[in-house]
Every structure is written in structure tokens, then in C-alpha cells.
Amino acid sequence: AMAFGIGYHPAFRIPMTEGHTDYELRFSQAESPVCIATNGEGLLTDHTYYLGKNITTIPVNRALFANDSHMMVGLHSKELSLVEKDTGRSVTCYISGYPYVLIWSAPGEPQVVCIDPWQSTPRPAEGGNRWEEKPAAAVLQPGETYETCLKTTFSGV
């Protein structure tokens, strides 16, 4: 058997065009994103929290990424977009089929926003370092195949 994890880490520069500062992440339907907390090393903890309740947007600002990233679990949306609010320009990642979606930017005023659809997770802070011990590791048996892709749409409006 072959154990593995896979995820994408696309990064999008903001501002998309000079003079624009108001951005948001937009779900394709209302969500109450549950996030798994990580420690300072990016490893999973036993804690969870809500990023919001029954929301369709998340403002992109310094406060959103003050404590690093947010790993959302079990979203129902098929798409998550980074939207320049005053022009409608956007980048849309199609996240359907990915059990985890991480959003990240370096601390400070966001200059790059990442929308990361993942099939697996980092390892737990308390636990082994073997792939087979990861809670979301995929395991392929001999003769099986696995295929994935990330569809992204850029809209200049």
C-alpha cells in the first residue's frame, strides 16, 4: 500500500491592480467554517473554532492572518474566490471534493493570499510522523489509482 497526502498552494498577489485595497474571500454558498487550530509549528491541535457563522464572505485584512492560517474543514461550497470588491475582479478556486481548505497570508498587511485545497492535513502535534498515522492520509492499494486537479478561474471584469 502507498500512503500519501496532497494539497495545492496557489498564491495570489494583492492588490490585483494599483489603488485597490478592499478584498474579501467569497464562498459560493453560506458557510459556518469550522477550523482546526494549529500550533506555532503548523501542527494540528485538538482545538477547533468557527471563522464565522452563516457567512458568505470573509474580509481580507491584517486581523484575519494575525495568528497565521485558517484550516477550514468540511465546506459545502464548490468555489472560494478572492474578490477585489470595488471592481469585481476575482480569482476563483474550485474546492469541491477537497475536505480541507486552508487560507493563508504572511502576518502584516496582506500582499499575497493563498487558497489551499487539501486532501490531507499536517500531522498532529501529539502523534507520530509516519504518513499512515496522519488522520487524513490517503492509502492506495496495489492496482488502485488516484487522480486530482485544481481548477482556477481568473476574471478581469
Predicted segments, located by residue:
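Short coil/turn motifs at secondary-structure junctions
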Residues: 11-15, 120, 155-157
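Hydrophobic residues positioned within well-ordered beta-strands of beta-sheet architectures
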Residues: 6, 23, 78-80, 113, ...
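Active-site/ligand-binding surface loops and adjacent short beta/alpha elements
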Residues: 11-14, 18-95
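Short, structured beta-strand/loop micro-motifs enriched in basic residues and often containing a Trp
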Residues: 125-132
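Short Pro-Gly-centered flexible turn/kink motifs
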Residues: 138-156
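Glycine-rich active-site loops that engage anionic ligands at enzyme catalytic sites
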Residues: 84-122
